[in-house]
C-alpha cells in the first residue's frame, strides 16, 4: 500500500552440474519515483552447486512513498558472479503491485459474491468478523485478517446460490448476537457464535435480504423476508424459527429484493414495506397480516424500498423498471418522481448534509443520482460513471474532515466521491472482476482507518483507505444498518461531530468514555439517543461488556 514498507526476499538456485558460484553480487534497482531501496547491494561469498541461497536474514528493505500512484512497479535484480575463468551476469525483471487492498484480501471465492458483507463481533472477543454468502452456496465468516473464522462451523454449505445479504441483532435476547441469511434453496438460516440456531423452510425462493425488527407484541425480535414465487408470501419468523402469528401473508406478487421496516404509527410494532416484481406495487403489510397498496408503477420493482424520516415526515423511495425513482409518503401520496432515463435496480441510500437529506441511487444508463427530498439535484450530480448500476451507495467520512464520501462499485471500478461530485484520491480503483454488491464501510482491523469491503464476481475485496476516518451515523452498509431495515432518520444531534466511542462528545475516545459506558451498564442510568448510539460500538442495539472491550481495544491500538 502507499506509505508502507516491505522486505523483498529472493531464492537463488545454482543448478547441478554447474560449479559453485563464488563472489556473488546482488544489485536491486528501480527507476520509479516513490520507491526507495534502503540496501540495494548484497554480497554472497559462495552458492554451492545444486543448492539454493536466500536472503531471509538480510532482505532488501523497500519504502513506498505515501504519495505514490496505485499500479505495477518494476524492479531489476542484477546477479553477477565469477568462478575461476567463467563469469555470470544476468538481469531479472519483476513487477510488484502497489494497491490499496487490505492485508489478507481479496478473499478468493471462485464464485460471485452478490451478498453485501456484514461486520459484527460474533464471538465476543472485541474484534470484528466479516460475514457474507456466495453463489457457490457457502456462508463465510472471516476474521479481520481475511482468514476463516472457526473452520468447524464455517463456511456453511447451503447447497444453492446465496443472493441475500446477512442481517444481525440479538434476536432472542440471550446476550449473543445472531445473524440471519437466506438461500435460493428456499431456506432462511439463523446463526450465533455456536453455529446454526434455526433453519426455516419457506418453500419459496428466497433471494432478497432479510430484515430484523419487532413485528409482534413479545420482547424478542423477528425476521422478515419476501418469497420469489407467484404467491409471493411475506414471511415473519420468530427467533426459534417458527412463524409469527398471522404470517406468512400472501400478496400474490414475486418479491425480488429485501423489505424495509419501521413503526409508522407509534404502536411499538414495525410495519413492512415491500416492492414487487409482478403487478409493480409498493405495499405496506402490518402485524395483523393486512396489506395496503401504496403505489402501482408502470413496470416491475427490482430495488428494495428505503425509508427516510426528516422532521415529522416520512418518505419511501423505490426504483422501477419504468425508468423512474418514486418517492411517496407513508400513506402513498406522491412526493416526487425522478425520470432516470433507464431501469433503476439500485436502492436509495440517504445522507444528511447540514440538515438537508439527499438520496443517492443509480440507473442502468450509468448515471449516479443525488437528489434532495423535493427531487432537486445536489450540485455536481448526477455523475456519469458508465455501466449499469445495480448496487447501492454507502457513505462514510473517509478522511475525518467532517464531510462524508459516497462509495459504490460499478463494473470493475470501485468509486469514492466527495459530495461535490469530485473523486477521492486514488479512486476509482480498478479490479479484475466486476463489483457485485453494495460496499460495507468499517474499520475491521481497528487500526483507526476505514476499509471498503465489497463482493465481486470472484472474490470479496477489501480496500484500505489509510486515513483516519469514521462511519459516524452514516448509511455505511447495505440497507443502512446491521438489521437491514432500510430506515434512516435525521435528528438534531447534541453532538456536532458524532463518533462511535466518543460518548461525551469531546472529539476523543478515551478512558472518560469507558467510564461513562461502565456507569450506564452498572447503574442502568438514563442516557441520550446520541450517547446510546456512541456507546454501542458493535451496533448490536445492546450496551454491554462487548462494547467496553471494543472501546478499550480502540484506545490501546
Segments the model singles out, each with a brief description of its role:
Residues 493-557:
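Cellulosome-associated attachment modules in secreted, modular CAZymes
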Residues 15-19, 124, 524-528:
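Extracellular acidic loop/turn motifs
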Residues 17-24, 244:
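Short acidic/proline- and small/hydrophobic-mixed sequence motifs that coincide with surface turns
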Residues 60-96:
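Terminal connector regions
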Residues 3-18:
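Short beta-strand elements of extracellular/lumenal beta-sandwich folds
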Residues 36-68:
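Intrinsically disordered, low-complexity Pro/Gly/Ser/Thr-rich segments with frequent PxxP/GP/PP motifs
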Residues 93-494:
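Extracytoplasmic/lumenal domain signature
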Amino acid at each position: 500500500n502507499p506509505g508502507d514498507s516491505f522486505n523483498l526476499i529472493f531464492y537463488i538456485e545454482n543448478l547441478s552440474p554447474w560449479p559453485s558460484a563464488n563472489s556473488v553480487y546482488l544489485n536491486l534497482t528501480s527507476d520509479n519515483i516513490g520507491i526507495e531501496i534502503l540496501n540495494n547491494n548484497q554480497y554472497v561469498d559462495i552458492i554451492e552447486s545444486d543448492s539454493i541461497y536466500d536472503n531471509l536474514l538480510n532482505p532488501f528493505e523497500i519504502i513506498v512513498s505515501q504519495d505514490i500512484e496505485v499500479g505495477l512497479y518494476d524492479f531489476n535484480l542484477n546477479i553477477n558472479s565469477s568462478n575461476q575463468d567463467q563469469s555470470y551476469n544476468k538481469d531479472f525483471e519483476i513487477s510488484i503491485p502497489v494497491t490499496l487492498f487490505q492485508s489478507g484480501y481479496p478473499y478468493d471465492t471462485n464464485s460471485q459474491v452478490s451478498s453485501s458483507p456484514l461486520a459484527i463481533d460474533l464471538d465476543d472477543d472485541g474484534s470484528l468478523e466479516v460475514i457474507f454468502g456466495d453463489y457457490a452456496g457457502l456462508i463465510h465468516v472471516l476474521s479481520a485478517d481475511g482468514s476463516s473464522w472457526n473452520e468447524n462451523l464455517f463456511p456453511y454449505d447451503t447447497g444453492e446460490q446465496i443472493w441475500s445479504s446477512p442481517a444481525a441483532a440479538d434476536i432472542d435476547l440471550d446476550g449473543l448476537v445472531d445473524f440471519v441469511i437466506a438461500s435460493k434453496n428456499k431456506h432462511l438460516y439463523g446463526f450465533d457464535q455456536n453455529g446454526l440456531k434455526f433453519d426455516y423452510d419457506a418453500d419459496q425462493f428466497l433471494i432478497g435480504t432479510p430484515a430484523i425488527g419487532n413485528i409482534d407484541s413479545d420482547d424478542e425480535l423477528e425476521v422478515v423476508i419476501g418469497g420469489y414465487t407467484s404467491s409471493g408470501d411475506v414471511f415473519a419468523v420468530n427467533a426459534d424459527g417458527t412463524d409469527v402469528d398471522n404470517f406468512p401473508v400472501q400478496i400474490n406478487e414475486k418479491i425480488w429484493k429485501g423489505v424495509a421496516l419501521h413503526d409508522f404509527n407509534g404502536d411499538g410494532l414495525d410495519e413492512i414495506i415491500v416492492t414487487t416484481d409482478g403487478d409493480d406495487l409498493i405495499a405496506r403489510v402490518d402485524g395483523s397480516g393486512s396489506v395496503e397498496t401504496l403505489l402501482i408503477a408502470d413496470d416491475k420493482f427490482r430495488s428494495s424500498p428505503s425509508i427516510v424520516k426528516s422532521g415529522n415526515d416520512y418518505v419511501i423511495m423505490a426504483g422501477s423498471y419504468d425508468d423512474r425513482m418514486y418517492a411517496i409518503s407513508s400513506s402513498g401520496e406522491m412526493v416526487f418522481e425522478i425520470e432516470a432515463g433507464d431501469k433503476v435496480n439500485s436502492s436509495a441510500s440517504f445522507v444528511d448534509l447540514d440538515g438537508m437529506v439527499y438520496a443517492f441511487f443509480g440507473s442502468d444508463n450509468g448515471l449516479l443520482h443525488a437528489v434532495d427530498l423535493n427531487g432537486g439535484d445536489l450540485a455536481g450530480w448526477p455523475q456519469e460513471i458508465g455501466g449499469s448500476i445495480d448496487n447501492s451507495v454507502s457513505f462514510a467520512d473517509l478522511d475525518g474532515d467532517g464531510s462524508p464520501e459516497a462509495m459504490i462499485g460499478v463494473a470493475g471500478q470501485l468509486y469514492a466521491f466527495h459530495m461535490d461530485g469530485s473523486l477521492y484520491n486514488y479512486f476509482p480503483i480498478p479490479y479484475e472482476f466486476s463489483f457485485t454488491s453494495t460496499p460495507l464501510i468499517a474499520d475491521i482491523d481497528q487500526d483507526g482507518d476505514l476499509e471498503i469491503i465489497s463482493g465481486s464476481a470472484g472474490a470479496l475485496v477489501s480496500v484500505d483507505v489509510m486515513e483516519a476516518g469514521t462511519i459516524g451515523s452514516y448509511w455505511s452498509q447495505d440497507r443502512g444498518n446491521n438489521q437491514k431495515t432500510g430506515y434512516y432518520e435525521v435528528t438534531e444531534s447534541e453532538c456536532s461531530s458524532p463518533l462511535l466511542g466518543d460518548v461525551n462528545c469531546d472529539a476523543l475516545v478515551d478512558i472518560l468514555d469507558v467510564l461513562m459506558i461502565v456507569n450506564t451498564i452498572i447503574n442502568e442510568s438514563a442516557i441520550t439517543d446520541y450517547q446510546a448510539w456512541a456507546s454501542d460500538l458493535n451496533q448490536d442495539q445492546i450496551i454491554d461488556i462487548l462494547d467496553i472491550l471494543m472501546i478499550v481495544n480502540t484506545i490501546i491500538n
